[in-house]
Amino acid sequence: MSSLLKTDFNVSKYRLIAQKREANAVEIEAALEVVREFIIKKKLILYGGIAIDYALHLKGSSIYPEGERPDFDMFSPNHVEDAYELADILYEKGFKQVGTVRAIHVQTMRVRTDFVWVADLSYMPPNIFDTIPTLTYKNLKIIHPDYQRAGLHLAFCFPFDNPPREDVFSRFKKDLQRYNLIEKYYPIPVVPVKSTYESKTFSIPFKQVAIHGFAAYALLYQTLNELRITCKVPEWKTEFPQPSYSYHKNDKNITLTVDMPRAYPALVLATYNPEGVIKEMGLHLTEICEPYMDYSPPIFKTNDIHFFSTMFKELAISIIQDNLIVVSPQYLLLYFLYGAFATPADKSLFLFYYNATLWILEKADSLLNIIQKQTSPEEFTRFANTSPFVLTTRVLSCSQERCTFSPAYRISLANDVQQSQLPLPKTHFLSNSLPDISTLPYNYYPGKGKEKPTNFNYEKNLLFNIGGKCTPSAM
């Protein structure tokens, strides 16, 4: 019997060959050079895979093969007008079939020529754009890897986002590889920060919410310590915080006592129904904060508890001691990065806790290796599936109207409603959650003779209020 020839599955190699042999390869390369010059001129900030690749080039590494066609993703504080301007430039230079269209990600505009995408421009509010850390590679501004980490953690926090290509299938492996490279070449230095603590007691429902923030760190640390004792490993010497907690429960609530930093004494909870939980708990809403890009959701603040809204999302969670629902370590890491970005005065504190959480995961991994050697594969799999220290697809259960319905889905539904001229029934679970599509950016095609849309109003559409601004509540 003849043996089969060995197949070369080097995808990158064949992608390069395919790009070079495309009929319009020369035109695409020329268009990308125009885009590159535009990015430099407008001082826009590259992000995504290309930013990671360029940052790694500065360290002698990469994620893409040499010569691969760049995929330009960029942030702009005026992305709609910039996208229109780039389309005009390409059209004036003689490129064909030029157009700018709204992407699936609502804050992104895509520019194409000859039906090939050459640029994605995403909105970043000026207050963030002007302060975000960057590096420079060949005259191009790229987002600093410290900020890029946040986007990589994000996919692990919401495993069922972006259906039908859910992140658990399409992003987990790729983002983990990229994160490990960033951690290797751009580690965040450990700078100890001394904090004073106070013991705080909170009464919270044991359904609909997940413990987050500094309290979640305390729960994860003590769970790690209990696992260390079980594995009979000597106590570690560490400079990282070692807060403690205790709790008891009744039929409806959990009373949690936990060591909290005096600078941040409020308990943070994640929930898909913040206003409902606040009402159920009899609390008074004092302040509402808009999202901070994709990295922090709307925050509903009361005097002692801050609620991170995960409405329309399914948040990855863990269960500790069969009773306590806690956010995944990935969401906690994202929280500490968000804190470092949004509150520069306490950046060192949040980054210290970020590194402390990484340390917890590192030590947990060493303990899991011990357990794996001492148990059967079946027993270890069962144990790992309930561990709070591993990537998980267990999510905070939610009612139908508050599950995974992305802005893209709701915009698509709003388009269908507009075209059919038939409103959703008032009883439909999304009847009060459809965006006003008349306030979204318009597509633009320079060669079709239609007048270019002007003066897009970012403040008029809530989907673009993503600068983290907080306002007192009228409630």
UniProtKB/Swiss-Prot annotation:
Belongs to the poxviridae poly(A) polymerase catalytic subunit family. Highly divergent. The lineage of its organism: Viruses, Varidnaviria, Bamfordvirae, Nucleocytoviricota, Pokkesviricetes. Transmembrane segments: none annotated. Pfam families: Poly_A_pol_cat. Polymerase that creates the 3'-poly(A) tail of mRNA's. CDD domains: polyA_pol_Asfar. It comes from African swine fever virus (isolate Tick/South Africa/Pretoriuskop Pr4/1996). InterPro entries: PolyA_pol_cat_su. GO terms for biological process: mRNA processing. One of its GO terms (molecular function) is ATP binding. It catalyses: RNA(n) + ATP = RNA(n)-3'-adenine ribonucleotide + diphosphate. This is Putative poly(A) polymerase catalytic subunit. Induction: Expressed in the late phase of the viral replicative cycle. It is found in: Virion. Keywords: ATP-binding, Late protein, mRNA processing, Nucleotide-binding, Transcription, Transferase, Virion. Its EC number is 2.7.7.19. Disulfide bonds: none annotated.
